[in-house]
Amino acid sequence: MDVNNLSSNWKKLQETLKKQSASSSSKKRKTSDRETQNVTTKKQKIETIERKKSSLKKKRMSEGQEHGGDESAQEPMVKTISHKSSTATISEQSRTESKPTKVNEGRSPTAEIGKYVAMDCEMVGVGPNPDNDSALARVSIVNFNGEQVYDSYVRPKEMITDWRTHVSGISPKHMAEARSLEQVQKDVAEILDGRILVGHAVSNDLDALLLGHPKRDIRDTSKHPPYRKIAGGGSPRLKILASEFLGLNIQDGAHSSVEDAKATMLLYRRDKEAFEREHLKKWPIRVVVDKKENGEDQKKKKKKKKPRKR
């Protein structure tokens, strides 16, 4: 074997290996550079997304603070409003619920009465048979929008033998600043005069007040046919109607006549057109025809002919 020739071949092999090694390392560097670039790009994208999320979160928080926590304040209302409430009813209820009511305020100095009012009363047991004998202890009236128009505790003339606090919410302490029955009668009569009265079994409330009201001006939710269906044709409870048709949870503990009056008005407003259709069946509109012509108020009476004397 030629040693010189072998040495020459060996050198060529080494040069070839060096070229291949250099080429391989160059490819590795390029691949590594691409991977590094990809990782950097991904990191930049992630950081951009995080920045956007963070800025959006801060913006929402600042908006919530500017509105004074409106979202949290309105959340309970969203839970209470249900499937069958109209948009108008929801918006009006949200607005009136936010307004504070003053217990035993008497006639509100700010609320406008309007054409429609809803009334509810709370009773206490009196006399030797308090389960059957009741007396008026509180009266509440709201307008069409659910704003409190009148609220007053009433001093019964009879001796109270059962406060019914767990139901009525009335206790002896409330009588300290209660108004007399005569004063409340006068106040309520002035409010109801010439207006449409909405109530639930409202005849009981009027009897307790010893007041009357024209039947054509009464809308009673306990007598509304679509609402009576839920009670199998009988008189439905206000609590059931409020839950089923308004999604409102009322009368869980002691009753509030203000709350009940508001629920009653909402029930009327929810189905107002049907209420008025039913009402027209009993009390059709009277059409007055003006028969006055040429200034004559009455028809000329025909003179009777006197029989001739023979």
From Swiss-Prot:
Pfam families, A to Z: RNase_T (PF00929)
EC number: 3.1.-.-
Domain Exonuclease: 115-277
Region described as Disordered: spans on this chain: 1-107, 287-310
GO molecular function, one term: exonuclease activity
GO cellular component: nucleus
Keywords: Exonuclease, Hydrolase, Nuclease, Nucleus, rRNA processing
Compositionally biased spans, kind Polar residues: 1-11, 83-93
SUPFAM superfamilies in UniProt: Ribonuclease H-like (SSF53098)
Main location: nucleus
Biased composition (Basic and acidic residues): 44-53, 61-70, 94-105, 288-299
Sequence ranges of Basic residues compositional bias: 300-310
Record carries keyword Protein biosynthesis: no
GO BP annotations listed: RNA processing; rRNA processing
Places the protein is found: Nucleus
Entry keyword annotation includes Nucleus: yes
Stated family: Belongs to the REXO4 family.
Functional note: Exoribonuclease involved in ribosome biosynthesis. Involved in the processing of ITS1, the internal transcribed spacer localized between the 18S and 5.8S rRNAs.
Name of the protein in question: RNA exonuclease 4
